[in-house]
A protein has these predicted regions:
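Cytosolic regulatory regions built on CNB/CRP/Popeye-like sensor folds
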Residues: 1-151
């Protein structure tokens, strides 16, 4: 299915962007499906894409030397996967593996960065929204650490 500005307007992360901004993002996007168990990306890999999750769940993990990956969180419906597209050195900070079958909108990161450079308002909006996601995840991690220390 083709990704359109109407498709993107319904995404929580992109709600409120102008139609021309949504059109610019739609030109960089496609719909993808991943089966349960599929590793979307590995920690430290070069960033090529980021995703908005339409259905399913993705586990975020970190590699611990000599151990299995440790799951540090999940991203579900409406969530953003792959915030590292915005920050140098453009490497994924965590790994991501599908817990269930996942349907998502995939954005080509270099093309989105080009559009942000051409439209600073779009760049500001996406950066602000990205930092909201990061702040929410940091708060969630903090809560889990506090709960563990009290257990």
């Amino acid at each position: 299915m083709e990704v359109t500005s109407s498709t993107l307007a319904g995404q929580r992360f992109l709600h409120g962007l102008r139609t021309d901004q949504l059109d610019a993002l739609a030109a960089t996007a496609s719909e993808v499906m991943f089966p349960a168990g599929h590793r979307i990306f590995a920690e430290g890999a070069s960033v090529g894409s980021f995703w908005l999750i339409e259905s399913g769940y993705v586990a975020l993990d970190v590699q611990v030397p000599g151990e299995r990956p440790v799951i540090i969180g999940t991203v579900g419906i409406g969530g953003l996967l792959g915030w590292s597209w915005l920050l140098l050195p453009y490497q994924y900070a965590f790994g991501a593996v599908c817990v269930t079958e996942v349907r998502a909108i995939e954005f080509r990161a270099p093309a989105v960065r080009d559009r942000c450079a051409a439209d600073p308002d779009l760049g500001h909006e996406l950066t602000s929204r990205m930092f909201e996601v990061l702040a929410d995840r940091l708060e969630g991690t903090r809560g889990r650490l506090v709960a563990r220390s009290l257990a």
